Structures are given as C-alpha cells and as structure tokens.
Amino acid sequence: MNATNDSKDINITRIYDAPLKAVWDAWTDPAQVAQWWGPRGFSLTTHSKDLRSGGHWHYTMHGPDGTDYPNRTDYLEVAPQSRLVYDHGANDDRPPMFRVTVEFTEVNGKTHMEMCMSLPSVEAAADARKFIKQAGGDATWDRLAEYLAMRVSNEDKFYINRSFEAP
C-alpha cells in the first residue's frame, strides 16, 4: 500500500503469477471472489452481481465474530480483462465510501494489478489507511495470490477415475 500522508488516494500494486484471464475471473466470478475477498477470517455471500457499467454487486461480508456487513458496489466502468472502476462501501443506509480504479495488464504470463482507491478527503484516506492496517494490511491481496496459486496449479492436473469389477 503506497501513498503519502497528504494524499486522498491509496495506491496498491501487485504482480500475480497467473495469466490475466485467471486474475480477471477471480475478480469477477462470484464463486471465485468468495474464496479470497476481504481480510483473513471473513467470508462473503454474493446476493447479486451485474458486472457492467451501471450494474451493481450486492454482497455481505461475514466477520469472524459473526457480524454481517452488507455492501453494495456500483460499477461505473467495466472493460473486460483490462479495467474496473467502481464506487465501494455503499449499502442501503449509506452512500459509497470511495471510488476504486483497478487496471490489469499481462506481462510474460503474469498479471500486473494497479489499484487506486480515491477517498473524498485526506482525512478520510488517513482513516482508511488506519483501518486497512488494523484489518490485516494487504491480507486481501495476499489471499488473492494464494487463491490464484492454488487455482492455476490445479488447472495443470488431469484426473482419471476408473472402476471395474475384478475377478
């Protein structure tokens, strides 16, 4: 996580040892997102996901203490396997907390992810940095890397199951 303390933006850059399509699918397929989104100890239930400009993702984060956190993401731009722009942290009772821009590029079979979280003020960004640190820092992005490593390694496996009756 990079940013100066006088910035309202928080920038995150990661390189994933996985092809672009695998990273994009992990971000956009509700079943895959549930495997890695959020801090360690949290789980996720997607209620609906309309991945298009003007679409919404309704989901609930389930905390390790049993607390539920209803969320809504509002998609502003969806460029398949390239870019997502969305407003994050809304629910039925509150407006979005910040805007996120994520760009994906593939270089030599690895995927570069550039993310910028734009908060409404320097103070809001400072509060977000503090919250992210308390919630485990970059744990979400580490979980994505772990999920992709497992997923990509399993794609190379081929299983044959056969049963027969022996005399």
Model-predicted segments: where are they?
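A conserved amphipathic terminal alpha-helix motif
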Residues: 119-167
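Glycine-rich portal/gate segments that line the openings of hydrophobic small-molecule binding cavities
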Residues: 45-87
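A short, structured loop/turn motif at beta-sheet edges
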Residues: 20-21, 51-52, 76-82, 103-112
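Intrinsic-disorder/low-complexity, polar/charged segments enriched in Ser/Thr/Lys/Arg/Asp/Glu/Gln
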Residues: 7-13, 20, 56, 70, ...
